[in-house]
UniProtKB/Swiss-Prot annotation:
The keyword Lyase appears for this protein: no
InterPro entries recorded: Cro/C1-type_HTH, Lambda_DNA-bd_dom_sf, Tscrpt_reg_MJ0621_prd
Entry-linked SMART domains: HTH_XRE
Entry keyword Nucleotide-binding: no
Limits of the HTH cro/C1-type domain: 21-75
UniProt keyword list: DNA-binding, Transcription, Transcription regulation
Highest taxon, organism lineage: Archaea
DNA-binding region per Swiss-Prot/TrEMBL record: 32-51
Gene3D superfamilies, alphabetized: lambda repressor-like DNA-binding domains
Protein name: Uncharacterized HTH-type transcriptional regulator MJ0621
Database matches in Pfam families: HTH_3
Record GO terms (molecular function): DNA binding
Length: 172
């Protein structure tokens, strides 16, 4: 059953509706803030929904339309990005077009080697077509999963900026 249909079936009870909406957000890998940005529903309105407060039918319609748009995207190939949360926060889009083909981007936060491996296995199980990760974990991940793996190589400017920061700290 599609997420949209599941949510509508829970409309009879506010508690069940809120519980199902939270579950759908988890399945989509979205925070309430991200859902707000995608749907155009103000964050404060969505917060009221999550708190079990009454809301307008127009809000329900927008929620359902947004969830449906993700269901349509299920046929689009997904690429996983495994990185620390601060790096993932710099990603501003959920969909990207490359060579005329659209891809969904799914974030997998990880802060250790073990978390990267777990995220890679989870991503593969969830059906991603490829994984982007840091060079230090790519060799290990390539041995574990059966999807293509690409690495993120920091730009020269990133290294220079880090060197400048550490030099300032040393001289303080």
């Amino acid at each position: 059953m599609k997420a949209c249909e599941r949510l509508l079936l829970k409309i009879e009870s506010q508690e069940k509706f809120v519980e199902e909406f939270k579950r759908i957000l988890l399945e989509l890998g979205l925070t309430l803030k991200e859902f707000s940005e995608i749907s155009g529903i103000p964050y404060s309105t969505l917060y009221k929904v999550i708190q079990g407060k009454d809301f307008r039918v127009s809000t329900l319609i927008k929620i359902l339309k947004t969830i449906r748009s993700f269901e349509k995207d299920e046929n689009i190939d997904t690429i996983a990005i495994i990185a620390a949360r601060p790096a993932l926060n710099k990603i501003t889009t959920r969909k990207i077009g490359i060579n005329g083909k659209s891809y969904l981007i799914k974030e997998y936060p990880a802060n250790s080697l073990e978390e990267c491996i777990v995220a890679a296995v989870r991503a593969e199980r969830e059906g991603v077509k490829g994984i982007v990760c840091a060079p230090i974990v790519s060799a290990t991940i390539e041995k574990i999963v059966n999807v293509p793996v690409a690495v993120i190589i920091p730009e020269k400017d990133a290294f220079m900026k880090a060197l400048e920061i550490i030099a300032k700290k040393i001289n303080e």
